[in-house]
């Protein structure tokens, strides 16, 4: 059985390891059992995959997205949906009380009410995703921009009032005001089209997040005519300054979560030690899918 866009041949994997392209036989970009486990694939998802494709001695190929489908189906009703900011920029609510902390009731999994709720701290200073703000937005951009009102997920409506920039013109802080009558998503007085997620700046925790992609170039195929591999230079992106909900401080190796609007992630079982938290992407949403999850 041949899985598209991955390296399966033992001698090719050995070369990737020897050349330092991957960090071992359990590198999450590979499809060994140890690699799949480290990336977050469950035994149930692998069994589902085998059941779907069938076991055959005949040579055949299966698209990698089939494996991703199986892990999504397995996890979607099992794991908590948490807020994590992968590329943070500070958001200050200028009219919010300075030292106030509110705890918002948030469903652990909107599709599985039996998983209950949790309390998420909300403060004057938050972090949001940098891509959720634009100074000069295109048409049909419904997230944050000057003068626009958006919903902070499970919290309040806020309206952007301005930005701070450094000497190079980079945005360092976004300012907004909030409407205290719009708390918790139950407000029906007016509608907004954009919803973005957030994490408290003072209560959030820091973590490293690793985003994995196909180790080979999807357009060119796995192998060249001479037998060499078309390595994707962007198969791993390491994000060092991510800010996550404080509850994730209790996460343990191989715990799995859905990061709202980003995808499914697993605590690395090799590099997460003590106070160092490392999350590996198991399944990333496309930008369209992320907007659908908002």
Regions found by a protein language model. Give the residues of each.
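Beta-rich accessory regions
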Residues: 163-172, 180, 261, 268-275, ...
């Amino acid at each position: 059985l041949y899985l598209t866009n991955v390296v399966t041949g033992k001698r090719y994997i050995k070369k990737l390891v020897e050349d330092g392209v991957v960090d071992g036989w359990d590198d999450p970009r590979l499809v060994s059992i140890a690699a799949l486990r480290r990336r977050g694939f469950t035994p149930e998802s692998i069994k589902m995959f085998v059941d779907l494709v069938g076991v055959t001695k005949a040579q055949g190929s299966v698209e990698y997205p089939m494996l991703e489908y199986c892990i999504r189906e397995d996890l979607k009703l099992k794991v908590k949906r948490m807020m994590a900011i992968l590329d943070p920029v500070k958001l200050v609510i200028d009219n919010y009380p300075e030292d106030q902390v509110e705890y918002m009731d948030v469903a652990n999994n909107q599709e599985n009410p039996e998983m209950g709720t949790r309390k998420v701290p909300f403060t004057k200073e938050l972090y949001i995703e940098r891509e959720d703000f634009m100074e000069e937005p295109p048409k049909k951009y419904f997230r944050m921009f000057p003068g626009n009102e958006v919903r902070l997920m499970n919290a309040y409506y806020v309206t952007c009032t301005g930005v701070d920039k450094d000497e190079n013109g980079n945005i360092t802080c976004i300012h907004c005001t909030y409407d205290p009558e719009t708390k918790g998503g139950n407000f029906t007085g007016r509608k907004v089209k954009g919803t973005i997620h957030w994490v408290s700046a003072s209560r959030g925790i820091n973590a490293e997040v690793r985003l994995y992609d196909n180790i080979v170039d999807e357009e060119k195929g796995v192998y060249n005519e001479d037998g060499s591999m078309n390595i994707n230079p962007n198969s791993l992106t390491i994000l060092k300054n991510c800010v996550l909900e404080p509850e994730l401080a209790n996460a343990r190796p191989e715990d799995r979560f859905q990061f709202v609007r980003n995808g499914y992630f697993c605590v690395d079982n090799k590099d997460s030690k003590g106070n160092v938290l490392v999350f590996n992407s198991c399944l990333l949403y496309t930008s369209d899918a992320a907007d659908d999850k908002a």
